[in-house]
């Protein structure tokens, strides 16, 4: 199937509204994410590899903020432990509907997947061995993030992991400037205009709030995780794994 091109912010907008994962975004999301997030494909692939190593027999694996199910599919194709299932959650009905269609095309559905349209903050997390927050926590209000991470930790089995991917910020202005500029250059190289970059940045300003890696690591420790490891970074995008 031909991938639809993201042109949502290509024309000047009369009024800037906050970014949301509606039908327009869902229609172009695969193109948008690949052209906007450096290393996205590598992150998705390695989520499957991490899940294959840390999934435990008879446990749940959660994909919280699953969007179209890329991380879910990566885990599903890699997990071989007995009696594992995946619970994929997103609060966008359009994402869940389209994700269901894409997952149905998987030719080797060896691991059961349950798709749930809900706020991830209201979902019960229990008997988990792997939990994924792939560019999801950044959309949760900062004052609510610790409570969510604590609930994830409480719902994980001993030896379980949380995979946390985020757009990150830097406390030093020079580093922040460098990484933001390089990210913009990455997007330009992938065909986005300066207008598109500027308008999308404005739309995301109030709904996506990045934090430093140090802030994430401190929160993970406060939530009870024994350790965490930064395993991927490209410009201002990173992925960590936290161990219970």
UniProtKB/Swiss-Prot annotation:
One of its GO terms (biological process) is tRNA wobble uridine modification. S-adenosyl-L-methionine binds at residues 40, 65-67, 90-91, 119-120, 134, 201. It catalyses: prephenate + S-adenosyl-L-methionine = carboxy-S-adenosyl-L-methionine + 3-phenylpyruvate + H2O. InterPro entries: CmoA (IPR005271), Methyltransf_25 (IPR041698), SAM-dependent_MTases_sf (IPR029063). Its EC number is 2.1.3.-. GO terms for molecular function: carboxyl- or carbamoyltransferase activity; S-adenosyl-L-methionine binding. Keywords: S-adenosyl-L-methionine, Transferase. Belongs to the class I-like SAM-binding methyltransferase superfamily. Cx-SAM synthase family. NCBIfam families: carboxy-S-adenosyl-L-methionine synthase CmoA, PRK15451.1. Catalyzes the conversion of S-adenosyl-L-methionine (SAM) to carboxy-S-adenosyl-L-methionine (Cx-SAM). Homodimer. This is Carboxy-S-adenosyl-L-methionine synthase. It comes from Geobacter sp. (strain M21).
